[in-house]
């Protein structure tokens, strides 16, 4: 039997770089919220212990794909603790809607969905804490998708505090370029000394993203999309880009602006949600 699982997008409603550690990683403060929009992962169980990704990603080796790595990590962790039923395997396919290098967390969300879904389907019995800890070894954004609640993140993104920001409507636009995260984080002009503030203070301030000035400077496509969106609503970069989003109170307002978008702007409208669609599907 094949089951389908949501793999939602996320937005960084704000993102501030507060420092850089000796190991090169940047410390930050950011606010994650999910969207009711994303990829869909289909899983069909196997009884021969094999993991097969039926929809390979161009340019990514099978064993390097985060979906496969997540499944293999769960197999190893559950087996090491005697919680993996014999023969646990899966055929996995993905209906991909989220762009790579877009700042929407697509790969991290895919990995988290696989961890949560296979843990459930195989009846391994690992806790969300255990799955989140495993997810962190795959990527800094994976734990928030595993835990499934909007969160204020600190450290390098691994210290999560659940929060409930307003669930607004967003027009999310892709400028047509992919921005590898290191391109932004290695830029010498990236702000790295934004003062740390409490979540209470940050929620009262106007939201912004420290990476935006670098993305706009280095990628004229990002600058063009933001310049257009800012004529209609508060807009900013998500993550390290390339996607940007404009914020609206109603779906109709967001759709009206999207209908006026120039032909070169590729976008969609989605609602911000504080409970992940993945976790809603499991209720």
From Swiss-Prot:
The reaction(s) this protein catalyses: 4-CDP-2-C-methyl-D-erythritol + ATP = 4-CDP-2-C-methyl-D-erythritol 2-phosphate + ADP + H(+)
Q: List all disulphide bridges recorded for this chain.
A: none
InterPro entries assigned: GHMP_kinase_C_dom, GHMP_kinase_C_sf, GHMP_kinase_N_dom, IspE, Ribosomal_Su5_D2-typ_SF, Ribsml_uS5_D2-typ_fold_subgr
This enzyme's EC code(s): 2.7.1.148
**Which UniProt keywords are present, listed alphabetically?**
ATP-binding, Isoprene biosynthesis, Kinase, Nucleotide-binding, Transferase
**Regions annotated as coiled coil:** none
Tell me the SUPFAM superfamilies matching this sequence: GHMP Kinase, C-terminal domain, Ribosomal protein S5 domain 2-like
**What's a BP term from Gene Ontology annotated to this protein?**
isopentenyl diphosphate biosynthetic process, methylerythritol 4-phosphate pathway
Q: Which family does it belong to?
A: Belongs to the GHMP kinase family. IspE subfamily.
The task this protein performs is described as:
Catalyzes the phosphorylation of the position 2 hydroxy group of 4-diphosphocytidyl-2C-methyl-D-erythritol.
Q: What is this protein called?
A: 4-diphosphocytidyl-2-C-methyl-D-erythritol kinase
Give the gene name. Answer: ispE
